[in-house]
């Protein structure tokens, strides 16, 4: 069993995948495996089958879904996700793996720099005062972020202890790529240490992502994230955050009209108590690894009860 599974995502842009893959293979650490999650369009022109496991995921709609699928296919104790276009520095993984020597470490947040000017793209993600998702350190100089803390890694470049993440149900797919990594980081903080490692450096110019999220979806996803955090926030903060975020989007709409759509979808979801959340509760919709497992167990249990009833009759 390898210690580290390196997972590279490819959704549309083959050159970005190859840029990342070349750097990973050149600097590949010992005791590791490399997986590529692709949309079915990559044909391995360089015959890398002996070094890389290619997994076709043509039905995947998000990076979050691809990550959950990759965790089920990977063999490593630590899983490292990279979006196509993210290029690691030499020995980048050594820094992160040292932190995992501590048993309480459940995730490591690497530093992502812009390839063009070496300014900070992000040092993970954090939850703002209004419970939005923000990129930590965006636009700052490299040396200015060493004292900053994050709530979790950005999924485009992230390290996780796989057993801990999977024990929590993996990534919540119904939160989309916009909030699933922040949600995972906050949940992992409840069971262990999320370590910010500004000396673990990767670089990015352009990043391969599956799709652009509409303003309507963005507002709905944020409401769903707030609903998940409602118990820890308290009802008052939950309602205040919903209204203040909507008001801010309306006030800034002249600069970005799409924010009106986001505010509308947020308030609509709040009023209707989020149709997707209700569907998950009523129908057992699968939004994570954990929910899939529970649904299978429930079906097996129901089947056993039915069989017992038939025999009794």
Regions found by a protein language model. Name each.
Residues 22-31:
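Short, acidic, metal-binding catalytic loop of nucleotide-sugar glycosyltransferases
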Residues 57-74:
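Glycine-rich, basic loop-to-helix element that forms the pyrophosphate-binding segment
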Residues 86-87, 91-127:
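Conserved donor NDP-sugar-binding/catalytic core segment of glycosyltransferases
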Residues 96, 150-169, 174-201:
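A short, conserved alpha-helix in the catalytic core of glycosyltransferases
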Residues 127-150:
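Short, flexible, basic/aromatic active-site loop/helix in glycosyltransferases
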Residues 214-220, 231-313:
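Non-catalytic, C-terminal membrane-associated alpha-helical segments of glycosyltransferases
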């Amino acid at each position: 069993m390898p210690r580290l599974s390196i997972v590279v995502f490819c959704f549309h842009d083959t050159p970005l995948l190859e840029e990342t893959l070349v750097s990973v293979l050149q600097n590949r650490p010992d005791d590791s495996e490399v997986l590529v999650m692709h949309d079915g369009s990559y044909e391995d022109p360089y015959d890398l089958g002996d070094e890389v496991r290619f997994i076709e995921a043509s039905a995947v709609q998000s990076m979050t879904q691809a990550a959950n699928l990759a965790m089920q296919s990977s063999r490593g104790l630590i899983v490292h996700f990279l979006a196509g276009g993210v290029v690691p520095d030499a020995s980048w993984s050594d820094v992160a793996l040292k932190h995992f020597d501590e048993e309480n470490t459940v995730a490591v947040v690497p530093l992502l720099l812009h390839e063009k000017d070496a300014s900070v793209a992000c040092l993970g993600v954090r939850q703002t005062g209004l419970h939005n998702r923000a990129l930590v350190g965006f636009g700052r100089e490299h040396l200015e972020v060493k004292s900053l803390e994050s709530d979790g890694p950005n999924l485009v470049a992230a390290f996780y202890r796989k057993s801990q993440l999977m024990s929590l149900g993996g990534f919540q797919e119904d939160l989309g790529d916009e909030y699933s990594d922040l949600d995972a980081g906050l949940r992992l903080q409840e069971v262990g240490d999320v370590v910010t490692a500004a000396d673990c450096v990767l670089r990015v110019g352009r990043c391969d992502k599956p799709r652009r999220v509409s303003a309507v979806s963005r507002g709905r996803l944020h409401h769903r994230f707030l609903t998940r955090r409602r118990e820890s926030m308290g009802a008052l903060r939950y309602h205040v955050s919903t209204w203040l975020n909507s008001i801010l989007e309306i006030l800034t709409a002249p600069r970005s009209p799409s924010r009106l759509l986001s505010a509308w979808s947020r308030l609509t979801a709040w009023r209707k108590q989020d149709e997707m959340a209700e569907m998950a509760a009523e129908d057992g919709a699968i939004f994570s690894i954990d929910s899939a497992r529970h649904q299978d167990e429930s079906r097996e249990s129901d089947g056993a009860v039915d069989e017992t009833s038939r025999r009794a009759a």
